[in-house]
């Protein structure tokens, strides 16, 4: 055995060389742990975990709840404990005996709950003292006899009721809604309900706002008009360019009034035109788009263009009558431009949509074209007379705005043509026999325009709106009907553009 490996234990220490340093340190650490063992905490017995060596006692509910288990045979007074009864017997000069503690250790007792469904009914979960099992049975399974007068809370154990009465009303719990509670459990229950109600109310309010926004967005018009300018809505589909049928090849002239904007880019020019000609359907390109301001200036035109402006192409007068008839029939789909004076004295325009349902008008126009494709000029004039007679059936009945505008435009253009000396060409557009028909029925047409027959037409849209009772009849010429035609519609000679109108629109 070498000196490097030997150890000296006389003094309890170690003498070692450098080669045995690691081994000695490890041994010293183990010895230190053996001298100072770790502290072990003593675990408390949880409620319902009694000593397995304890005596288990099961009492009936009646015996357990009895307040006076020990009775005096002299006076009948009852006591909860036997020791109290023995002391009472001493007052009656009766033999009494108190229990003496012996040196022998007494076996511990535990009590089980008489309720079979209770968790403490099992012996392994029995409670350790008689008072504890009594209070447990009263609180969990007994009747709550004591009631607090302040908060109406009830208790089954009298001691609990007394402890609550001392602190009841001294502390309050206030909810955000303003309700005050003295009991914390009631406050917690109410607060949970109040928070859930607030969240539900916020959700319903958000849903109602979203629904109203959707309804408002859905009620917007397909087209918005601003100062006589047609602006298609970006969120809604645009109507087709031909609401009254396929386009017909014809000459575009100066009397068509497509509603266009003055400032437009190249993309707007390349798009299909969504404007609607006043009397005939057809496409117009960007070279033929004319602003409304340009219509104020006089421009040269031929009488044939005047006929086409009113009736379309003379070769297609059957289709023209169909279009005119559909315009008169569906008067609820055509709204004439109305002018309003604002506070500054300027004139602004409120132009509603020119048509409500394009598909419906197209179908109705096609159906009407089959029925009246061969309608003659006489039938057209009779239809105009019937329309005037219908509008004057009662003294308070007036012609609608759509019919008035249509008749005014019809009479103004026809009278202008007659004054220019083109009456033969005017009636020739209806057919070969239209001139003879007009000359033969001259007296009859004059009777239609007679005010005594009750057929009068308001001469201006402003008078129609502001003074519906004011009607007047304008005769052609200063001589009182001294021309080749008669004012059989009673609208008089009236131009389209007025000095009080804006952009040439009434």
From Swiss-Prot:
One of its GO terms (biological process) is regulation of DNA-templated transcription. PROSITE patterns: ZINC_FINGER_C2H2_1, ZINC_FINGER_C2H2_2. Residues 9-21 have a biased composition (Low complexity). Interacts with SHR, SCR and JKD, but not with itself. Interacts with SIEL. Binds to RGA and SCL3 competitively in the nucleus. It comes from Arabidopsis thaliana. It comes from the Eukaryota. GO terms for cellular component: nucleus. Residues 183-195 are annotated as: SHR-binding. Keywords: Activator, DNA-binding, Gibberellin signaling pathway, Metal-binding, Nucleus, Phosphoprotein, Repeat, Transcription, Transcription regulation, Zinc, Zinc-finger. Residues 22-33 have a biased composition (Basic and acidic residues). A zinc finger (C2H2-type) spans 70-92, 111-141, 146-169. Residues 1-53 are annotated as: Disordered. GO terms for molecular function: DNA-binding transcription factor activity; sequence-specific DNA binding; transcription cis-regulatory region binding; zinc ion binding. This is Zinc finger protein MAGPIE. The modification Phosphoserine is found at residue 60. Disruption phenotype: No visible phenotype. Roots of the triple mutant jkd mgp nuc contain patches of undivided ground tissue (GT), indicating that cortex and endodermis layers are not fully separated. The quadruple mutant line jkd mgp nuc scr has short root meristems, lacks endodermis and miss Casparian strip. A zinc finger (CCHC-type) spans 173-196. It is found in: Nucleus. Gene3D superfamilies: Classic Zinc Finger (3.30.160.60). MGP expression is SHR- and SCR-dependent. Induction: Up-regulated by the transcription factor JKD, and down-regulated by SHR, SCR and itself. Pfam families: C2CH-3rd_BIRD-IDD, C2CH-4th_BIRD-IDD, C2H2-2nd_BIRD-IDD, zf-C2H2. The gene is MGP. A motif (Nuclear localization signal) lies at residues 133-140. Zn(2+) 2 binds at residues 175, 177, 190, 194. Zn(2+) 1 binds at residues 148, 151, 164, 168.
């Amino acid at each position: 055995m070498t000196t490097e490996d030997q150890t000296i234990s006389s003094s309890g220490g170690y003498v070692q060389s450098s080669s045995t340093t690691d081994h000695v340190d490890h041994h010293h650490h183990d010895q230190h742990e053996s001298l100072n063992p770790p502290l072990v905490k003593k675990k408390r017995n949880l409620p319902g975990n009694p000593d397995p060596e304890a005596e288990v006692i099961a009492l009936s509910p009646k015996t357990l709840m009895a307040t006076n288990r020990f009775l005096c045979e002299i006076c009948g007074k009852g006591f909860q404990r036997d020791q109290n009864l023995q002391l009472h017997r001493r007052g009656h000069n009766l033999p009494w005996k108190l229990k003496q503690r012996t040196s022998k250790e007494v076996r511990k007792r535990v009590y089980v709950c008489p309720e079979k469904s209770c968790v403490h009914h099992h012996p392994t979960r029995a409670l350790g003292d008689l008072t504890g099992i009594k209070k447990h049975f009263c609180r969990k399974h007994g009747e709550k006899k004591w009631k607090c007068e302040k908060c109406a809370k009830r208790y089954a154990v009298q001691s609990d009721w007394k402890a609550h009465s001392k602190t009841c009303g001294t502390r309050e719990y206030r909810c955000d809604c303003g309700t005050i509670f003295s009991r914390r459990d009631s406050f917690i229950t109410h607060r949970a309900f109040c928070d859930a109600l607030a969240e539900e109310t916020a959700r319903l309010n958000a849903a109602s706002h979203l629904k109203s926004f959707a309804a408002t967005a859905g009620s917007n018009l397909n087209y918005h008009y601003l100062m006589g300018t047609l602006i298609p809505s970006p969120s809604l589909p645009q109507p087709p360019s031909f609401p009254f049928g396929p386009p017909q090849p014809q000459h575009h002239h100066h009397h068509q009034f497509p509603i266009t904007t003055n400032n437009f880019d190249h993309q707007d020019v390349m798009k299909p035109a969504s404007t609607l000609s006043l009397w005939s359907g057809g496409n117009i390109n960007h070279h033929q788009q004319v602003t409304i301001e340009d219509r104020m200036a006089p421009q040269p035109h031929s009488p044939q263009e005047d006929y086409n402006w009113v009736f379309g192409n003379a070769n297609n007068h059957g289709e023209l009558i169909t279009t005119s008839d559909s315009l008169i029939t569906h008067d609820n789909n055509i709204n004439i431009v109305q002018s309003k004076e604002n506070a500054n004295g300027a004139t602004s325009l409120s132009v509603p949509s020119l048509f409500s349902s394009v598909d419906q008008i197209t179908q109705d126009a096609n159906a009407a074209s089959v029925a009246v494709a061969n309608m003659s000029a006489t039938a057209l004039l009779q239809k105009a007379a019937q329309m005037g007679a219908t509008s004057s059936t009662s003294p308070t009945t007036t012609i609608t705005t759509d019919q008035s505008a249509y008749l005014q435009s019809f009479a103004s253009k026809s009278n202008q043509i007659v004054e220019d000396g083109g009456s033969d060409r005017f009636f020739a557009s209806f057919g070969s026999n239209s001139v003879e028909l007009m000359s033969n029925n001259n007296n009859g047409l004059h009777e239609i325009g007679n005010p005594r027959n009750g057929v009068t037409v308001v001469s201006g849209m402003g008078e129609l709106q502001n003074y519906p009772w004011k009607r007047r009849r304008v005769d052609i010429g200063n001589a009182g009907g001294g021309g080749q035609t008669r004012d059989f519609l009673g609208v008089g000679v009236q131009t389209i553009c007025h000095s009080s109108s804006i952009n040439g629109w009434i």
